[in-house]
Amino acid sequence: MRIAVIGAMEEEVRILRDKLEQAETETVAGCEFTKGLLAGHEVILLKSGIGKVNAAMSTTILLEKYKPEKVINTGSAGGFHHSLNVGDVVISTEVRHHDVDVTAFNYEYGQVPGMPPGFKADEALVALAEKCMQAEENIQVVKGMIATGDSFMSDPNRVAAIRDKFENLYAVEMEAAAVAQVCHQYEIPFVIIRALSDIAGKESNVSFDQFLDQAALHSTNFIVKVLEELK
């Protein structure tokens, strides 16, 4: 099976790249694509760059050029739910934009005109990730909504404003909704699996620098387990 894995930053893709066999890397429009073998699958690993425009552009190139059957978006995120700690892993059930507001024209907050309010992750991929999370003993793995915006969430006032807009939001980051929207348009199954590098609004910038590598390790190890179970 041909599986695409997307991470925004070098720190988020480096560990998985090192695990690929027969790896070959090429750069298209500034986006780095590495093809290789892992867990019996052909894996295309994309380093997309940070933010929604980079994520949307590179995911479009990925789907057009490499034709993956499924897409997994990995990397770090800021925890939003009160039950979460740095290092925990969040599996998306749904992904939304948290910085889109066209409510003046009767759209839901976060809804892009012409698009659904949120993008549902593939149920089979979520179920498979849930199965894998049952084997995790040292870290907490949960599933829930992830929201995306082109801002790092270090401002407590901004965090509070987003809490008012979305109930049961588990994590925030800067690429997933763009990846999900492109996959929705191409009808490609996707899931987002993110490990927490910080807790949004609580000295997030300091925590991010300290725990990015830990978050990358947790998310990569979890994705390897998913690939091993994927048939």
UniProtKB/Swiss-Prot annotation:
GO terms for cellular component: cytosol. Keywords: Amino-acid biosynthesis, Hydrolase, Methionine biosynthesis. The keyword Protein transport does not apply. The keyword Amino-acid biosynthesis applies. It catalyses: S-adenosyl-L-homocysteine + H2O = S-(5-deoxy-D-ribos-5-yl)-L-homocysteine + adenine; S-methyl-5'-thioadenosine + H2O = 5-(methylsulfanyl)-D-ribose + adenine; 5'-deoxyadenosine + H2O = 5-deoxy-D-ribose + adenine. The active site is at residues 12, 198. One of its GO terms (biological process) is nucleoside catabolic process. HAMAP family: Salvage_MtnN (MF_01684). Belongs to the PNP/UDP phosphorylase family. MtnN subfamily. This is 5'-methylthioadenosine/S-adenosylhomocysteine nucleosidase. The lineage of its organism: Bacteria, Bacillati, Bacillota, Bacilli, Bacillales.
